[in-house]
């Protein structure tokens, strides 16, 4: 345990280091934070914090910077404080869903970009898993001679648009008939479905088209459940360029691999979680990931992540994720 005064000093060091990117000295602390104690007392308390591994000294400066343990202690206190706060939700994600005519993919793309612009960090938003949702309707629209747009409407009200390449010249009436057949058979994905298709179709072309439609729909829903929308990728590169150029490549490889997807999909708690440096991966000592869960309703849920340097404005990001969706 650390004393209240040591906690105040640690908080001040973390916040100054995040704001200015420079190690913090005792004189600077007194000037910026109006600490009503002598420089000698501050230096003594900083020595205690250093012995506890909460702050560390760099060779090029007389100041101190937070260690990973120091950031961890600071963040834990923040999370403890915010867990007791009631916040008014902005419901921005639901607004975007309406604005994009309930197209989930479009809404999440805009949401990732907005989060990045507000937080000034790179953001990831994971598409919700539709396994708990039910397909209510399938509509087919002829876009051009070689393209049919399949509109999938879920029981939650959300919509997915799927492009289906087809040069079979079905008119709109035939497409409506096929749409109604597929919609009626959605609850019968079993061994009898193929027999029903054979009985329903009037040509081999129709049978080929319906089987292609069903396969495309299943593949799309499966793939979308693993989709990740990224906003502000360049922001992470810019932030790391300022501190450690050599760390950029492994971080980008991690984000673009299945490992980040696995990390985010393991989030089952609605609470905000923060992983710092090596807590994420041994090769990622320079970044932090703040994660949370969002939901459109009780069944349709996904994950949000904000990624930045370990010297992140944690308080701003935590408050944002508490309110935005």
UniProtKB/Swiss-Prot annotation:
Gene3D superfamilies: 3.30.450.40, Heat-inducible transcription repressor hrca homolog, domain 3, Winged helix-like DNA-binding domain superfamily/Winged helix DNA-binding domain. The keyword ATP-binding does not apply. Keywords: Repressor, Stress response, Transcription, Transcription regulation. One of its GO terms (molecular function) is DNA binding. One of its GO terms (biological process) is negative regulation of DNA-templated transcription. PANTHER family: HEAT-INDUCIBLE TRANSCRIPTION REPRESSOR HRCA. HAMAP family: HrcA. Belongs to the HrcA family. Negative regulator of class I heat shock genes (grpE-dnaK-dnaJ and groELS operons). Prevents heat-shock induction of these operons. This is Heat-inducible transcription repressor HrcA. It comes from Staphylococcus aureus (strain NCTC 8325 / PS 47). The gene is hrcA.
